[in-house]
Amino acid sequence: MKNEANIAFYNTSPKYEILMAVLIGIGICLTRLATAVSQIALAIATILAAYLWWKNGKRLNLNDAARQYIKVVCMWFIASFVSIIDVDNKAVVFYYFLGDWIWRFMVFVLVVAFINRREYLLKILTVFFCIFSIDCLIACYQFFLLHWERGRGFHGDYLDLTAIICMVLAMSAIILLDSHFEKNIKKFALLGLVSSIAGLFGCFGRGAFLVSALVAPFYLYYYLRNSKKMAAIILIILCLLGGAVLSSPKYVERLSTTLNTTTNRSNVDRIWTWKASWDMFKDHPVNGVGLNNWGWYYRNAGYKYDEEKQNLPHAHSNYMQLLAETGIIGFFGLLCFYGFSLIISFRRWIKHHNPLDLIFFTAFLSVMVLFGFFQPTYRLSSVLRVLWFILALTIQLRESIFIGEKYEKQL
């Protein structure tokens, strides 16, 4: 049976499956540690994928869930791309769309089309947990020992890492709490959970604390009501974390400004950019000002309010940025994409209690819906690649889960 599965891999040698898994794994795991290496690995994987697609009669081997989700994402992409119709810089918008939208989504396509073996998926996840943990620990070192204003991890904006933390924290907790996962991956999930919590403190981000707190009830309620012992352990951990926060004036002061919309400059300026985005939408309601054109219109077309003092480069919101850039058409596509991602996964979770559906739901809710409220996460390269990987991972692993039984490895 194993040999039959190997031969069936796009009518080529089974070695290609291993090579694809290695390349995709490098591309995902090194997206923050070594961006250039990550990009090269994904480019080679994409070229190899084109060869395998051609070798397989110009067909991709996709399960129904992956095929359906790709269609939904493409509908959102097309609705957003309509914004190119009446812009002056069509070439620039087209290049941005290919580079920042299509290219990043290739991570999802590569995983669902070319990594079917459970062991390969879990090995990639294991390496990801390890590198992610180093990223978080570096952020702690930067914040606590080097006394940086905020820890950033390997590189980039600190918000990149905090957005990823929100996803990984929920995913790690679900893997640990669910009885079906193997002990080996649970060990690395524990590493991911501890590192995520440390990263929350090291990155010193208000949004990450808020998002993590809002998402936690979705997975804690189900697991804790079925285990008094686990409920007691989690309660103790939460009390310790709460005590650590409350005992530190620095964290209390920082978190107390989360909802301050009157005197906190960061929050106030965000609101002014949202007002500017609304003005852009009112002037270009159908298909917006064009993808990635928000910054030019904000600086040069009179939309910036004098009250906004930081000269922010974007609208600090998935919703307001895309409303301004893609208009009603693109925003409707965004809402359909959000609705499908949340409703379908949550329905499946309620019906089957499949932990992979819950991971899908919490990852999307964390990054795109909640974190995206105050940061345009769809623009963040490393964040999007990790999100697409986690969503693809859940779809692929779901095929090997049988409710009420232990996992069965795919051959």
Q: What annotation goes with each model-predicted range?
A:
Residues A198, G202, Y223-T263, K275-D283, ...:
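A membrane-periplasm/extracellular boundary helix in multi-pass inner-membrane enzymes
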Residues A21, I44-A50, I174, F337, ...:
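Transmembrane alpha-helices of multi-pass inner-membrane enzymes
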Residues T261-K275, N287-T326:
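Long extracytoplasmic/lumenal interhelical loops at the membrane interface
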